[in-house]
From Swiss-Prot:
Listed Pfam families: dUTPase
Chain's role: This enzyme is involved in nucleotide metabolism: it produces dUMP, the immediate precursor of thymidine nucleotides and it decreases the intracellular concentration of dUTP so that uracil cannot be incorporated into DNA.
Phylogenetic lineage: Bacteria, Bacillati, Actinomycetota, Actinomycetes, Kitasatosporales
Cofactor(s), by name: Mg(2+)
EC number(s) reported in the record: 3.6.1.23
InterPro entries given in the database record: dUTPase (IPR008181), dUTPase-like (IPR029054), dUTPase-like_sf (IPR036157), dUTPase_trimeric (IPR033704)
Xref: NCBIfam families: dut (TIGR00576), PRK00601.1 (NF001862)
Protein name: Deoxyuridine 5'-triphosphate nucleotidohydrolase
Protein's GO biological process: dUMP biosynthetic process; dUTP catabolic process
Catalytic activity: dUTP + H2O = dUMP + diphosphate + H(+)
Amino acid sequence: MTRGPVDVLIRLLDPDVPIPSYGHPGDAGADLVTTEAAELAPGERAVLPTGVSIALPDGYAAFVHPRSGLAARCGVALVNAPGTVDAGYRGEIKVIVVNLDPRESVRFERFDRIAQLVVQQVEKVRFHEVAELPGSARAEGGFGSTGGHASVDGAEGGITHGGNSYASVVSDREGQ
């Protein structure tokens, strides 16, 4: 069963900013742009304005996700990905970007696409304190305990934490 689109009220804080839109049919994220030009040196971060604020219906939240092309081509990431926009928030949506490229600066021009906004229905939960949780196949395994990465699977000289062994990816990359 396909639901229709969710109606979201939007306020344009910059009269020239485009309303967030989807690049292709079926896309999950609507593109957000920056309203200010900025240049980030390697390792530098900035909070970029999008020129929009929204009012989500109760039971929904929006999540600010990175754009894969910026990550792949420029080394740009979002510091708090995904950023959460709660239904009651009415301020401007801003995006915290960081330039992870070790050598090159990255420049953003006004109205460059910098992130994607994904709107999702969210559930409210009630937490019930218990002395013990029921068992599961996974138990307390986390942080790579299911494998699937060469640096974690059978890593020699790795770090052991809670019975799990981890490779020091940072040390490996820095040649230490």
